Amino acid sequence: KNTLFKQSLYISTLAYLLSRYNQSKKILKDLPEAQRKVVLVQELLAAEPEREHQLAELAAVVGMSPWHLLRQFKKFTGLPPHAWLVQFRLRKSLYLLKQGCEIATVAQLCGFSDQSHYTRHFKKSLGCTPAQYLAHKI
């Protein structure tokens, strides 16, 4: 039923990430090594925000210890990786809500365990529920 929608969403997200990656490659050369690794982790998280990422796995990909990655990530982004990922998921969810997706579908596509989990994070971050947000946007 939603297969075509999911595929088109996946392809548009992939195209967006590829364009960002090409732009960021030029900028990355000028960054310190630790910051380049943090940017790479951000790109990995952004490429699959619906997935549950493990800190040890991300650290291994960029050649850092989990503890060092955690410190460096927070230093350069202001948030630990999980909090950054939740914020990224919420930004993605706003886009999907504006496109007319149902709240339960948005929760699933953005990697929240269920609609209630999504609503809690949404309200904590934005001060209203997704339904209230949609009611005020219309």
Model-flagged regions — what are they?
Residues 1-7, 11-62, 75-83, 87:
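Short, Lys/Arg-enriched, Trp-marked, Pro/Gly-tolerant hinge/linker segments that flank
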Residues 60, 71, 75, 108-109, ...:
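Alpha-helical residues within the helix-turn-helix
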Residues 5-8, 117, 121:
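Short, charged alpha-helical segments
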Residues 127-136:
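Short, basic/aromatic-enriched C-terminal tail that caps enzymatic domains
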Residues 42-47, 52-56, 75-115, 119, ...:
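Terminal helix-turn-helix DNA-binding modules in bacterial transcription factors
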Residues 4, 65, 112-114:
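Intrinsic low-complexity/disordered segments
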